[in-house]
Design a protein with these regions (language model features):
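Non-catalytic, mobile gating and regulatory segments of ester bond hydrolases
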Residues: 1-103, 107-179
């Protein structure tokens, strides 16, 4: 749904009982936040090949220090979440009492993973993280300090799940589920 036009997406949200929704977009980085009385979903859009800022983010594999000295993360992925973070964090302040589910595909999966970690560091504990075709996001230290139930869905032939290379210090987080 993160790839849909906001108007079409809103119709789908309401169909499934999520009458509250917010679309956040800045410089190519996008996410939806939808919620009802008990649950909230934060969904991040992945790479759109025609979106140059997405391609630049994917290629910027230089590790940068994560928040609170908890290890290093992919600089490009961190840069993308930084673009939407202020607006997202403002919205999350209103929904933090709900079961927060975070999801994303490809680049969006990486953004979702960083989002889950940042929320934890702010004392908000996501209920669950679901990523699809996500690349590796952080180094061993960063991955070990992420404490959220994470279902990482991956097609064994998807090259995105194999980058950045583990030889560069990157690691996956979560329970891997091959589809």
């Amino acid at each position: 749904v993160a790839y849909k036009d906001p108007e079409d997406a809103n119709k789908n949200f309401e169909k499934y009982g999520f009458n509250n929704h917010r679309f956040i977009e800045k410089d190519g980085a996008q996410c939806y936040v939808i919620w009802n009385d008990t649950d909230a979903i934060i969904a991040f859009r992945g790479t759109e090949p025609k979106e140059m800022s997405d391609v630049k983010a994917d290629l910027n594999a230089i590790q940068r220090q994560g928040m609170h000295n908890t290890g290093d993360v992919h600089g490009g992925f961190q840069g993308e979440i930084n673009k939407v973070w202020d607006d997202l964090n403002f919205t999350v302040a209103d929904i933090q009492d709900r079961n927060i589910h975070i999801t994303g595909h490809s680049l969006g999966g990486a953004m979702a993973t960083i989002c889950a970690k940042r929320l934890e560091e702010e004392g908000i504990h996501p209920h669950c993280l679901y990523t699809y075709g996500s690349p590796r996001v952080g180094d061993r230290k960063w991955v070990k300090t992420l404490d959220v139930t994470h279902y990482r869905f991956q097609n064994n032939n998807d090259v995105v799940c194999k980058v950045p290379f583990w030889m560069m210090g990157y690691r996956h987080h979560g329970n891997n589920i091959y589809i």
